[in-house]
Amino acid sequence: MSTHAILTIVLYVGVLLLLAYPLGGFIDAVMSGQSITSKKPFRFIENFIYKVCGIDPAIEMSWLSYAIGLIAFNILGVLFVFGLQLFQGILPLNPQGLVSVSPDSSFNTAISFATNTNWQAYVGEGTMSYLTQMLGLTTQNFLSAASGIVVVIALIRGFARNSIKTIGNLWVDLTRITLYVLVPISVVYAIFLVGQGSIQNFDAYKDVKTVEVAKFDAPKLDADGQPLKDEKGAVLTGPASTDQQTLPMGPVASQEAIKMLGTNGGGFFNANSAHPYENPTPLSNFIQILSIFLIPAALCFTFGRMVRDKRQGWVVLVTMILIFLTVTFAAVHFESQANPVLTNLGVDGAMGNMEGKETRFGIDDSSIFASITTLASCGAVNSMHDSFMPMGGFVPLWNMMLGEVVFGGVGTGLYGMLVFAILAVFIAGLMIGRTPEYLGKKIESYEMKMVAIAILVTPILALVGTAIAVMSVDGVAGIANPGAHGFSEILYAFTSAANNNGSAFAGLSANTPFYNSMLAIAMWFGRFGVIVPVLALAGAFAAKKKIAVNEGTMPTHGPLFIVLLAGTVILVGALNYVPALALGPIVEQLMLPVIH
């Protein structure tokens, strides 16, 4: 472990806490209708939106109405983005003349951005027009982030309220979190990125002359422009060279800001945050990883304020930080090791495993970024996870298997962790013979059924999807690396989709009707198959009477509960995947020293 890695992580946690604490208080004030929302200019904008949309902000919803409204809202978003891709060829802001996207890819992308997954089976700069990127994908980045935040706010209200059958107004919650939190921060963030070197324009792509002539092997073509092949079917190649390069342009900074802040992760370019137009400098790289955890950390403080016990928020946050530190140090350690396969070929391994990494970021910043982006449901990358060492790739895969509850996505991480907190209290109650209670609310059979559904949905989707893929011809056809790593690529894809992360072991050819359809199904049910039971929990807790603290109440604000909560997350959340992990990265690591 290098000094640079340790100092970076320490600085990161320190700055994160300094920024998250006031933001958490601000979110509490915004969602309760205080602070900035009471100022006349902002109140006018908010009320104008309600009037145009026909919303009565005074009417609250039951959990079922809240859930139906949220699902319907996201279905409309899916249909809009799907249609935008199908007709982008005839729409404006398309200087490259990019054609319409195929129906299966459009379906996958529309689901992906609506569920905050941002899985991308396409090449952004070669597929999506500026209009599609801005009006479709960037808009969904805001709305999907807001959708996650309002769900956790509703759950917190459930804990805070006493014998009330409503959990808030969905449309008011969506409006306020977008108008007062996501948009203002994103505007400032985008300006910062432009200052660092990110681009923001509507220019056509630029052809430039390179400093050096690039030499490479190019396929030989026949008169019809088709590649020539030898008698064995291999493509014939010949030497070629060029001094020309095409530089893609576009409104990058505005999409990049909400991509990171909203833990969306979908890049404007195929290389994502490894591309210098998205992530130009070490400072922009630090701010990007900081922004991934900013709102998830702030919501822990919001939680403590809303339930009138700040200690509860600190317990959840400390649990998240401890798990984050453990897996991040592990990621840096594994990637700092030389690849024995390359070492046997005489390659100097002193720098560690630099394959798939930007030299400007190196081992430390690439590994830290990988750990953060997979703990959160972000999925943005500044290096290629598929090129990590077997155990280095194990870490981001395992991070997602925890259920995206260690900080996790905006909103989704905290409500996922609170689900595990309920389970931890229930398990502790069984062990010591106490009636399980959490935050003054009794936990009964209905609540535990909802907890079980919320926890089991994602592993079922990930493992069943992986099993179907490895047993089907279409699934196996996408594997470029047969063996343990090929299995890991499929497992990673379905784990990423089901947990709404969106990162990939990109060696898998996933832009096919099979994977576009299967992964879209995993993304949709991985999102709303958890949201619905969480909202059901919110409604159930809101309707319950608060129970006064007594001698039989288990304390949930001390070090013991931190250990219990972390143990529950690790044992229950990740053990479902142990057999699959044994077939993938673990066996690949064991085989590594004997590969020649």
Curated annotation (Swiss-Prot):
The answer to whether keyword Ion transport applies is: yes
Transmembrane helix as a keyword? yes
Q: Which UniProt keywords apply?
A: Cell inner membrane, Cell membrane, Ion transport, Membrane, Potassium, Potassium transport, Transmembrane, Transmembrane helix, Transport
Question: Where is it found, in Gene Ontology cellular component terms?
Answer: plasma membrane
Covalent S-S links between cysteines: none
**Membrane topology listed for this record:** Multi-pass membrane protein
**Sequence intervals crossing the membrane:** 6-26, 67-87, 136-156, 177-197, 283-303, 314-334, 413-433, 450-470, 518-538, 560-580
Under Pfam families, the record lists: KdpA
Write out the annotated subcellular location. Cell inner membrane
Which GO molecular function terms does the record list? P-type potassium transmembrane transporter activity; potassium ion binding
Q: What is its main location?
A: membrane
| Subunit structure of this chain's protein | The system is composed of three essential subunits: KdpA, KdpB and KdpC.
Q: Which family does it belong to?
A: Belongs to the KdpA family.
Q: What does this protein do?
A: Part of the high-affinity ATP-driven potassium transport (or Kdp) system, which catalyzes the hydrolysis of ATP coupled with the electrogenic transport of potassium into the cytoplasm. This subunit binds the periplasmic potassium ions and delivers the ions to the membrane domain of KdpB through an intramembrane tunnel.
Q: What is this protein called?
A: Potassium-transporting ATPase potassium-binding subunit
* Species this protein is from: Polynucleobacter asymbioticus (strain DSM 18221 / CIP 109841 / QLW-P1DMWA-1) (Polynucleobacter necessarius subsp. asymbioticus)
Query: What does the record give as the organism's lineage?
Result: Bacteria, Pseudomonadati, Pseudomonadota, Betaproteobacteria, Burkholderiales
- The gene behind this protein is kdpA
